[in-house]
């Protein structure tokens, strides 16, 4: 592991937090470059960072800038990622090439988990995780996020899986790999824009202290892999199920008709759904990320107390 440090560059705030042994929360950057339009992307990222600070933890937004892995971003780097058009969506397979070619990369759930683990960060906040795409029986289009959750020791606080995916198969894959699906104050697995997906979670926890004890036990026992912390979107911002289902079905059909596949699929679908819902889906997306940031900060603080 001694060669790792030469690839990582820590923002001053994160460096100080590590030196002082303070709780840190990792954040991904795909949401900035590929998940939301400018300026909402930068505004959301800044507010999420502030919410984590208010919760007693230190935010570390992760990205790659000119081939350097950044653990925590400066304001300039954040603006650059939010506006630049030449930012690669970087998952596990992309990291070595982006570094070697000195490119700019926005980290997905998978690559953020990898970098968080290298930096010793145990809690990561995102909107939703990737999963098994609809029709994967033919295409084998399965997000690398699931394999990462199977092997990397980071807890991922999310609002479940976007219903653009096959949620049932996604949960089956996670079960096969022994990844616990934990509902935060819920028995229902959320579907990103809505509070329920029709599927349950493995366990529900009442508070972050209970969740922190479970994480500590998991990793103390050397049970490798992450945990999905499913935190439903607040009721006030949840979308109407019929409306969002119709929008998603329409977007999925258009993507198929246009032959859109691979890593282009999710950004295309999100943009299309935003159009169809007249911006309501973007508002929901922003609010669920804020809600996850709040719980993520509390969890990082609770886990830190146990160590």
Swiss-Prot record:
Cofactor dependency: Mn(2+)
Active site annotation, chain numbering: 28, 162
Cofactor-binding details, from the entry: Binds 1 Mn(2+) ion per subunit.
The UniProt record lists the keyword Hydrolase: yes
Class of the enzyme per the UniProt entry, highest EC level: lyase
Residues given in the record as Mn(2+) binding sites: 141
Any one GO molecular function term: pseudouridylate synthase activity
Catalytic reaction list: D-ribose 5-phosphate + uracil = psi-UMP + H2O
Binding sites annotated in the UniProt record for substrate: 89, 109, 143-145
Name listed for the protein in its UniProt record: Pseudouridine-5'-phosphate glycosidase
Species assigned in the record: Alkaliphilus metalliredigens (strain QYMF)
Organism phylogeny: Bacteria, Bacillati, Bacillota, Clostridia, Peptostreptococcales
């Amino acid at each position: 592991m001694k060669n790792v440090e030469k690839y990582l560059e820590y923002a001053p705030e994160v460096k100080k937090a590590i030196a002082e042994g303070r709780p840190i929360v990792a954040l991904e950057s795909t949401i900035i470059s590929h998940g939301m339009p400018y300026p909402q992307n930068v505004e959301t990222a800044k507010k999420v960072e502030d919410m984590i600070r208010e919760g007693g933890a230190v935010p570390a937004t992760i990205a790659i800038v000119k081939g350097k892995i950044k653990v925590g971003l400066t304001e300039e780097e954040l603006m650059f990622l939010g506006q630049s058009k030449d930012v690669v969506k970087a998952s596990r397979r992309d990291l070595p090439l982006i570094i070697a070619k000195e490119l700019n990369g926005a980290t997905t759930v998978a690559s953020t988990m990898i970098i968080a683990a290298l930096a010793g960060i145990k809690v990561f906040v995102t909107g939703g995780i990737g999963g098994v795409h609809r029709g994967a029986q033919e295409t084998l289009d399965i997000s690398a996020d699931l394999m990462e959750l199977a092997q990397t020791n980071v807890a991922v606080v999310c609002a479940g899986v976007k219903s653009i995916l096959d949620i049932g198969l996604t949960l089956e894959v996670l079960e096969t790999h022994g990844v616990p699906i934990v509902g935060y104050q819920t028995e229902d697995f959320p579907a990103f824009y809505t509070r329920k997906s029709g599927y349950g979670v493995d366990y529900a926890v009442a508070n972050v202290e209970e969740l922190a004890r479970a994480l500590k036990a998991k990793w103390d026992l050397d049970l490798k892999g992450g945990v999905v912390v499913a935190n439903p979107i607040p009721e006030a911002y949840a979308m109407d199920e019929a409306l969002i289902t119709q929008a998603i079905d329409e977007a999925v059909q258009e993507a198929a008709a246009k032959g859109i596949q691979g890593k282009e699929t999710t950004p295309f679908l999100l943009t299309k759904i935003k159009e169809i819902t007249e911006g309501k889906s973007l508002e929901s997306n922003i609010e669920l990320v804020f809600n996850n940031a709040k719980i993520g900060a509390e969890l990082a603080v609770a886990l830190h107390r146990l160590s």
